[in-house]
């Protein structure tokens, strides 16, 4: 992480204090997790499917509410917020989903402008009259992920990798203090997966943002992040520098030997 960028960016810390999440069906997705993410860190969250990775990410922006403990993001105790207070906090938390969540019939530009809704008068959003300031932010976000040339293209006409870059630009246009990415490279080919991860790395290095990314690919975690958080059956089982994480550490997180599907490699 670039310390100079961090000094000029309103990047937030994230703190989990004995957080548990139990779903209505009785499934305990998180079990007494205590964890602090420092401002400007680039963190990989790894674990098998069902380990609690997505739940952890979603408690940060209030999409999932902690049933025990507290989740604090910057100045906000997220699990206590409701209504406008929660919407305002979410306006500072960028979120990138595996499924892109784009409006396929709208242009790339219109999709990216959605990230400005929390900062813009409601009537402008309703009528589609963005301010000149919002337009410039959208253009800059698209340029930063290398897809400005597609600004007027319909989102549905893009490739999977291009759609994910638009999703990143949309999150960037929020001017966030935290960036969350939930399996952002799932189903992408190796070159595109590396491209998306470089975009996230650039956001961390240049913008100084706190970035948390859920990954199931060990080699990508090692190449692009600096800290590893491991979850197994909802419990925090590993937390340390990614440079110190051995194959045995990953096997302990997964509860099994490393398999080919855990590595991106050069597979098609």
Curated annotation (Swiss-Prot):
It catalyses: phosphonate(out) + ATP + H2O = phosphonate(in) + ADP + phosphate + H(+). It is a peripheral membrane protein. GO terms for cellular component: plasma membrane. It comes from the Bacteria. Residues 14-258 form the ABC transporter domain. CDD domains: ABC_PhnC_transporter. Its EC number is 7.3.2.2. It is found in: Cell membrane. Disulfide bonds: none annotated. Keywords: ATP-binding, Cell membrane, Membrane, Nucleotide-binding, Phosphonate transport, Translocase, Transport. The keyword Endoplasmic reticulum does not apply. ATP binds at residues 47-54. It is an enzyme of class 7 (translocase). One of its GO terms (molecular function) is ABC-type phosphonate transporter activity. InterPro entries: AAA+_ATPase, ABC_transporter-like_ATP-bd, ABC_transporter-like_CS, ABC_transpr_PhnC, MetN_ABC_transporter-like, P-loop_NTPase. The complex is composed of two ATP-binding proteins (PhnC), two transmembrane proteins (PhnE) and a solute-binding protein (PhnD). Belongs to the ABC transporter superfamily. Phosphonates importer (TC 3.A.1.9.1) family. Part of the ABC transporter complex PhnCDE involved in phosphonates import. Responsible for energy coupling to the transport system. This is Phosphonates import ATP-binding protein PhnC. It comes from Corynebacterium glutamicum (strain ATCC 13032 / DSM 20300 / JCM 1318 / BCRC 11384 / CCUG 27702 / LMG 3730 / NBRC 12168 / NCIMB 10025 / NRRL B-2784 / 534).
